[in-house]
């Protein structure tokens, strides 16, 4: 597999500004992610003393998996005080989208580089956001149908949308297998298809909860790298978090004030507010099989889906004795994560790192230092066919990744059309506009006639526009093969107007290039970069 790094002219300049150590952006974080001294400081930080307990919890969470020797060793390293690089993601259907895998590769790559540079073991940890309850965000994925040259949405259907956390959801296995079958119908048959399907079927048979199936697929893919997994909703982990839940409840108003103040500062720097929440407690409580947002009305803590209320002593008592009922929101999850782990760096997606930029004062309030916040690696897979099509139509890869192919497609259509025809129609449009101006001069002061002339002009312009559009549409139809090839490029490299990794599913890559494609023996060694990585399997 070949690997190269390309620099894109990105519309969103947040990550390029991190790369260049822009003082406005770096001021939103505790550390400058582009400076080596930041890593030296984090590597020398004193540990929090929770590492041995965490190692035991992670071992228990992964006890239903057959651990690799690398994972066994990393659990021991963690217990002995090794620091971590961490990142997380919701449990998407069949492991999707692709950037979930890329986030894990980011964690692996950075932890290895830090281990090599500082001669201290750094452990890669992936945090599964099993506490999330928005099932609509994880119950679907997309598959590319090569025969049609188009993407298809594949969705796991339920009679009722679950309102509990994803970790507490147990999907119907027959329905999930039907969803998997639908996905494979759209994918082309390769020598890898049957083996991949058997792996997925086995995972569905062997595991019961939504997040356990997700964990099993990730483990199958990344165990050789020594990645450790933990679910935010895992009950023994929640018991470790009880002291912090109590602190959050006691300081909830100060926490909310700190968050709002930091968010306002980011807006004053010209950034859009990323975290949208009305709560002033920033925790959820599981009650009546629903994950319910907690808020405080000045007297009571109340839940948003039932009429239950609690006084402070009651809700703190729940946090102490039943912490597994609590879960964090977007504000408190980073805080809890960093309170638990001895983190060198947190790896996040483009939106995630903007969330963290709104939390600096929250970390300071709880005397927890914000780690280095690193943008994850961004990766696109370029196969031989698409590379040949880019060459055929002389389209720069970097341009497609940012803008898609619509501009190049329109240019191609016009190149196939009669230039004289287009020029004459456009000339007629310009002539009509001049005529309209002359006629308006003739009827100046008479509003009825002005309206009449303008309406006449509008009709003529519409007719000429229609003529030109229909003519170009006919050219499209005459070049149907080329149009299909432009669609192939678009759906592969810029699907739904964005990067491939945001839409495509990892199973597509595994099916096309083999079930070992992401393994160390096959996948190219990566170097950490803020630019874009192109991999040619």
UniProtKB/Swiss-Prot annotation:
One of its GO terms (molecular function) is ligase activity. Residues 422-450 form a coiled coil. Keywords: Coiled coil, Ligase. The keyword Coiled coil applies. The keyword Nucleus does not apply. Transmembrane segments: none annotated. Its EC number is 6.-.-.-. Belongs to the BshC family. HAMAP family: BshC. Involved in bacillithiol (BSH) biosynthesis. May catalyze the last step of the pathway, the addition of cysteine to glucosamine malate (GlcN-Mal) to generate BSH. This is Putative cysteine ligase BshC. It comes from Staphylococcus aureus (strain Newman).
């Amino acid at each position: 597999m070949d690997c190269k790094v390309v620099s894109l002219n990105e519309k969103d300049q947040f990550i390029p500004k991190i790369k260049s150590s822009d003082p406005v952006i770096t001021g939103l974080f505790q550390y400058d992610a582009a400076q080596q001294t930041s890593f030296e400081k984090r590597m020398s930080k004193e540990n929090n003393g929770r590492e041995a307990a965490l190692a035991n919890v992670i071992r228990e969470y992964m006890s239903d998996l057959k651990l690799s020797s690398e994972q066994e060793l990393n659990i021991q390293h963690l217990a002995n005080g090794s620091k971590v690089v961490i990142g997380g993601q919701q449990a998407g259907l069949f492991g999707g989208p692709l950037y979930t895998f890329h986030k894990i590769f980011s964690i692996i790559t950075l932890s290895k580089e830090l281990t090599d540079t500082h001669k201290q073991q750094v452990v890669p940890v992936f945090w599964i956001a099993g506490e999330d309850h928005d099932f609509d965000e994880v119950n679907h994925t997309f598959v590319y149908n090569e025969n049609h040259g188009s993407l298809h949405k594949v969705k796991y259907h339920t009679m009722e949308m679950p309102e509990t956390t994803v970790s507490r959801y147990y999907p119907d296995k027959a329905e999930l297998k039907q969803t998997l079958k639908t996905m494979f119908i759209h994918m082309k048959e390769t020598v890898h298809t049957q083996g991949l399907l058997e792996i997925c079927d086995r995972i569905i048979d062997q595991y019961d909860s939504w997040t356990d199936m997700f964990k099993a697929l990730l483990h199958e893919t990344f165990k050789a790298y020594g990645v450790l997994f933990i679910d935010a909703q895992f009950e023994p982990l929640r018991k470790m978090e009880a002291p912090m839940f109590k602190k959050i409840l006691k300081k909830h108003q100060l926490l909310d004030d700190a968050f709002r103040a930091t968010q306002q500062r980011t807006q004053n720097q010209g950034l859009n507010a990323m975290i949208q929440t009305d709560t002033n407690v920033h925790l959820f409580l599981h009650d009546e099989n629903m994950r319910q947002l907690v808020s405080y009305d000045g007297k009571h803590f109340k839940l948003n889906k039932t009429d239950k209320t609690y006084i402070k002593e009651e809700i703190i008592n729940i946090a102490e004795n039943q912490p597994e009922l609590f879960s964090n929101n977007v504000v408190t999850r980073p805080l809890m994560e960093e309170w638990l782990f001895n983190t060198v760096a947190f790896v996040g997606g483009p939106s995630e790192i903007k969330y963290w930029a709104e939390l600096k004062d929250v970390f300071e309030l709880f005397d927890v230092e914000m780690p280095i916040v690193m943008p994850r690696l961004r990766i696109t897979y370029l196969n031989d066919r698409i590379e040949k099509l880019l060459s055929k139509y002389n389209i720069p890869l970097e341009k497609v990744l940012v803008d898609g192919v619509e501009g190049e497609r329109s240019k191609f259509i016009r190149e196939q059309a009669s230039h004289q025809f287009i020029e004459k129609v456009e000339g007629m449009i310009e002539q009509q506009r001049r005529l309209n101006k002359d006629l308006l001069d003739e009827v100046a002061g008479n509003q009825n006639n002005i309206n009449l002339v303008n309406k006449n002009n509008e009709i003529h312009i519409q007719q000429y526009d229609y003529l030109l559009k229909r003519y170009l549409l006919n050219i499209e139809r005459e070049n149907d093969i080329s149009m299909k090839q432009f669609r192939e490029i678009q759906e592969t490299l810029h699907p739904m107007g964005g990067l491939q990794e945001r839409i495509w599913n990892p199973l597509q890559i595994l099916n096309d290039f083999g079930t070992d494609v992401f393994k160390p023996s096959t996948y190219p060694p990566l170097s950490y970069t803020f630019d874009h990585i192109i991999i040619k399997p």
